[in-house]
Regions:
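Peripheral (often C-terminal) accessory segments that flank ATP-dependent C-N-forming ligase machineries
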Residues: 2-99
Length: 99
């Protein structure tokens, strides 16, 4: 799940303090940095596509839910992410389970 700054891909602010990174305790998850910087002791935004939240699960549905749980814990002024990532794979998985 790419977590981006408001305004991306056009103009976006930089230097917004990112919160929640130290509180993530979702098993088998990771947060990858791309548009971040370290200012004093704070991790701040420094790009449009700021972070990427990923997670594992026993299936696609669980992995997506875990990744979204990670993304929900991360915040800064103007952060956003799409809420439809993986929907086709999740639908296919559900359809296969109902057959």
């Amino acid at each position: 799940i790419v977590i981006a700054s408001d305004g991306y891909p056009e103009s976006y602010s930089k230097g917004d303090v990112i919160t929640g990174l130290d509180d993530i305790q979702i098993e088998d998850s990771r947060v990858f940095h791309s548009g971040t910087a370290l200012e004093k002791n704070d991790i701040v935004t420094n790009g449009g596509r700021v972070l990427c939240a990923v997670a594992l699960g026993k299936n696609v549905t669980e992995a997506a839910a875990n990744a979204y749980a990670v993304a929900e814990q991360i915040d800064w002024k103007g952060s956003f992410y799409r809420r439809d990532i993986g929907y086709r794979a999740i639908k296919r998985e559900r359809d296969e389970q109902s057959n």
